[in-house]
Amino acid sequence: MKHLTTCLMALLLPLSSQAQSQDAFPDRPIRLIVPVAAGGGVDTAFRTLAPYWAEQLGQPVVVENRPGAGQAIGIDAVAKSKPDGYTLAGVGVPIAFNTALGRKLPYDPVKDLTAVAEVVTQPLLVVAHPGVAAKNLRELIDAARSQTNPLPYTSGGPGSYGHLWFEMVASQYKFNRQHIGYNGVAPALRDVLGGQVPVLIDAIVPTGTQVKAGKVQGLAIVRSTRSPMLPDVPTLQEQGLNLPNAAPFYGVVGPAGLPPAVLNKLNDTLVRALRSPALQAKLTDMGFDVVASSPEAYGRKIRQEIDLWSKIVRDNQIKAD
């Protein structure tokens, strides 16, 4: 009996140690890999969030930029990390779009990662050169449907959210269009300002500043209500357009197999941080809408986005590379 008791204690000790470790989580800094270069919207969002999250966790949140391959390099590093909650990623749209666009990835975004929380979204904005006769998106669609020549438009680049979203619009409302691809939104916006391309679809920041300055006209904000940043730009629903309020979304993921206690702690502290009025004010000023979702809701969102945009890519034969 003594021998049996000793054996049972030996078996239970590792489990007890693991439970105590999870109860003490976190007991050291958390590394948040942001898979883009410093300075962009994804990086700015997570660097703004990090100190507020750290305050709730009681440990520093160290942001580490690891760009490359459409965010795949940084995401893969997290997918292959130890599932202890100390290595996470702050990701953008490519968490779903890389798969939807058929890119070969060293990880599966559903099977190899754990969704922690959706953090923010950033509404899409449809703008046009002042010389365009249409004063809203409904008028632009009606004009495009009445002509045989394709409507030229641009976005943040081939395979960007604005690109795929407008392809969905064109498919639903059945008009010809031609996507003019640029390497990023800066050259695209420059040519819209110059009148070389009439229409641009991209996130509200930085494009919204040009609407405020009167250099382009805002045709629609892809949001359930008008944006505080651009209160004069109408929503889709106000224009009678039956389209989803899809938007670029940012969230936190970890490797597959995160212990439930660790996942709950990460989500709980992250949600509490995002409820801070000071942080919400900063993010709102940057053009973000705070979400602060559960792990289940964020995981479901990733799967839904993959399914939605995979169909758009297939139906419209979109190639991003």
Model-derived segments and their meaning:
Residues G41-A45, L49, G74, V93, ...:
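Stable alpha-helical elements in mature extracytoplasmic
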Residues T5-L15:
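Bacterial N-terminal signal peptides
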Residues W53, K80-Y86, A100-P187, L236, ...:
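Hinge/capping helix and adjacent helix->loop/strand transition within the periplasmic-binding protein
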Residues G92-V93, P130, A203-V205, R223-S224, ...:
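Short secondary-structure boundary segments
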Residues D108-E118, N176-I180, P198-V199, G208-A246, ...:
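Short beta-strand->loop
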Residues D27-P29, Q172-F175, K212, E238, ...:
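An extracytoplasmic/periplasmic, membrane-proximal ligand-sensing/linker region
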Residues A19-K111, P150-P152, P158, K174-A203, ...:
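N-terminal (or domain-start) structured segment
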